[in-house]
C-alpha cells in the first residue's frame, strides 16, 4: 500500500508526530508537500479546478487544502497507481493499523482495483447512516456503505477510477458548484453519483482535534483549516445582507421557537444513525 501524508514542508511538529505514529507500527509512508496560497496553488487550480480560483467564499487555506488532495491524485494517476491511501498530518491510527496499511492483499481480495471506490478509514464522530455492502469483514472491522454526509479527509483509500471521476467532475464545475474537498467527497451521496464509499467500522483513524473534542480533551496539534473556516464563516455573517438591526432583532425575538424547531429536526435526522467508533 502506498501511504501518502499531506503535510506542509515547514510543519516540523506534525511531521514528527506522523513519523512516530507510522514508524512505531512499521507502516511505510511518504510525505506529500501540501500547497499553501502561492503562485504554485494558482497554477494548480488553473490546470485542474479552474472554477476554484474565483470561488467567493472558500478561503485561500481551504483552496490549498482542496488542491493538495487533487494534485496528489493527479500525481498518482501519472504514476499509474491503481489506488493510494491518503492521510493528513494530524491523524491518529487505531489498533492493528499496520494490517491495513503495511499490506494490501486484503484490499485486492475485497475490491476490484479497476472500479471506482473509496474506503473511508476515518471517523469524525458524527451521526451517520450506513447500509450493508456485502464486503467481508477484515480484522474485526466491517465495510458498510456510507449513505449520508461524513466530513473529513484525514484518512481514506481511493482507487484510480475514483480519482479520475473527481478530477473530471471538479474540472467541469463552476465556482458555485464547488465546496470544501471533504464535502465534495463525503457529502450527499447523490452528488458523487452514488459512487460507493465504504466506511470502515470501527474506524482505523481519526483527526487528533476531533478525537480530543469528542473526549472533552485539549488538542495537542490543533487545525489550521478549522481555524480558517471559523474566521471565514464569521466574516461571511458580518458581510451578509441579513446582518442588519431589523434582522438581528427578529432573530432575537424568535430565538426560542427556532431552537425548539432545530431540536425537533435534529431528533428526526438522528433516527437510524450511528457514531462510527475509533479504536
UniProtKB/Swiss-Prot annotation:
<dbReference type="GO" id="GO:0016757">
    <property type="term" value="F:glycosyltransferase activity"/>
</dbReference>
<comment type="pathway">
    <text>Glycan metabolism; lacto-N-neotetraose biosynthesis.</text>
</comment>
<dbReference type="Pfam" id="PF01755">
    <property type="entry name" value="Glyco_transf_25"/>
</dbReference>
<comment type="function">
    <text>Adds the second galactose to the lacto-N-tetraose chain in lipooligosaccharide (LOS).</text>
</comment>
<keyword id="KW-0328">Glycosyltransferase</keyword>
<protein>
    <recommendedName>
        <fullName>Lacto-N-neotetraose biosynthesis glycosyltransferase LgtB</fullName>
        <ecNumber>2.-.-.-</ecNumber>
    </recommendedName>
</protein>
<comment type="similarity">
    <text>Belongs to the glycosyltransferase 25 family.</text>
</comment>
<dbReference type="GO" id="GO:0009103">
    <property type="term" value="P:lipopolysaccharide biosynthetic process"/>
</dbReference>
<comment type="pathway">
    <text>Bacterial outer membrane biogenesis; lipooligosaccharide biosynthesis.</text>
</comment>
<keyword id="KW-0448">Lipopolysaccharide biosynthesis</keyword>
<dbReference type="InterPro" id="IPR002654">
    <property type="entry name" value="Glyco_trans_25"/>
</dbReference>
<keyword id="KW-0808">Transferase</keyword>
